């Protein structure tokens, strides 16, 4: 009987121990997922992510900058605005939005600018606007531009009054209402226009706003992915132009690939943004020149006979030649192998230089 009691007690203790052990669960063991074995030489297919493809829906390449822009803008005719370039008129307004800027010498050692805008919207002030010279008419014409100016030299009057170029004159005729004077400045350095006035003038005169389907691209352009590095060119990090009054120069910034413009000893800025003017391409176009009057007469630039020059981009420069078939055609620029030059997308500054002064420009 005693033996049976001990057996029962022992069984009770064991049962208690087992129940106590069941009160605390053991953690589930971690199971590693091993890949299925493969035969030697068998490839394992893995899912790769394709790089995102940039789309340009609703956009087109600008015929004047080579950049992607709104497709409705890419088919518009540009406007060309004559802009004064003397110290008293600084800062100029709107130059930072231009697609192409021409700088030409005029009388007395000064230069005058012509800014070409395909997208001329959003500018509350443009200029100041000054008078036309005959050769500027032909530079504007090759862009099929609507030309805004404030008067003209006597030699330009006949062509401006003809049907050769659509133009709006802020001094004579009915065009004055599309310009305004800033009374805080003295005339003639105080005439300006705006985007709205430009658009109103074009509408009032009934000028077409669309480029012809046959116009094409004004220049040949590389792409952003494959820029033209001018690997055979010489270094061109500072370009100094021999214009007596403004004494302008450009300095290259290798970080953004732009040439920053200086004149009158300081950065040249756009009064709309207070940002320094910077461009991607510089073309120096050397031309024959004459004086139409004796003494300090009216300068005339030969825009058609062809000549030499320089093409500058991405910190390099090469020699070029240029030609133009007619008064209405585009100027073409060629490298020393006879190939048309390829610009990089962005703004272009064209320097018109008299042949007699071409060797006084410096490129370093």
Predicted regions mapped to residue ranges:
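Bacterial N-terminal signal peptides that target proteins for export
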Residues: 1-9
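Sequence-pattern detector for short linear motifs
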Residues: 5-6, 27-29
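C-terminal motif of bacterial Sec signal peptides marking the signal peptidase cleavage site
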Residues: 18-21
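Bacterial signal peptide processing site
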Residues: 23-25
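A surface/extracellular/periplasmic glyco- and lipid-processing/surface-interacting theme
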Residues: 28-102, 107-364
């Amino acid at each position: 009987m005693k033996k049976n009691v001990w057996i029962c007690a022992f069984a009770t203790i064991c049962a208690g121990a087992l129940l106590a052990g069941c009160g605390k669960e053991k953690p589930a063991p971690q199971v590693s997922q091993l890949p299925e074995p493969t035969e030697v030489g068998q490839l394992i297919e893995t899912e790769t992510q394709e790089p995102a493809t940039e789309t340009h829906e609703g956009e087109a390449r600008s015929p004047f900058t080579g950049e992607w822009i709104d497709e409705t803008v890419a088919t518009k005719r540009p406007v060309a605005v004559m802009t004064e370039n003397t110290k008293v008129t600084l800062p100029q307004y709107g130059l930072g939005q231009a697609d192409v800027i021409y700088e030409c010498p005029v009388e007395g050692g000064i230069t005058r600018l012509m800014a070409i805008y395909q997208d001329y919207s959003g500018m509350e002030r443009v200029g100041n606007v000054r008078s036309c010279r005959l050769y500027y008419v032909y530079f504007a014409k090759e862009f099929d531009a609507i030309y805004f100016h404030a008067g003209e030299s006597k030699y330009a009057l006949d062509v401006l009054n003809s049907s050769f170029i659509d133009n709006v004159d802020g001094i004579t005729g009915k065009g004055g209402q599309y310009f305004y004077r800033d009374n805080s400045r003295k005339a003639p350095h105080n005439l300006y226009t705006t985007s709205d006035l430009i658009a109103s003038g074009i509408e009032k005169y009934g000028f077409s706003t669309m480029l012809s389907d046959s116009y094409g691209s004004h220049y040949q352009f590389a792409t952003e992915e494959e820029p033209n590095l001018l690997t055979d060119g010489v270094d061109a990090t500072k370009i100094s132009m021999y214009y007596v009054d403004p004494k302008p120069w450009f300095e290259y910034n290798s970080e953004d690939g732009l040439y920053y413009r200086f004149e009158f000893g300081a950065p040249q800025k756009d009064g709309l943004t207070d940002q320094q003017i910077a461009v991607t391409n510089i073309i120096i176009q050397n031309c024959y020149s004459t004086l139409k009057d004796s003494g300090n007469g009216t300068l005339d630039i030969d825009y058609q006979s062809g000549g030499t020059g320089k093409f500058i981009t991405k910190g390099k420069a090469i020699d070029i030649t240029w030609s133009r078939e007619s008064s209405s055609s585009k100027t073409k620029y060629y490298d020393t192998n006879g190939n048309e030059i390829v610009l990089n997308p962005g703004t272009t500054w064209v320097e018109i230089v008299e042949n007699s002064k071409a060797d006084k420009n410096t490129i370093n």
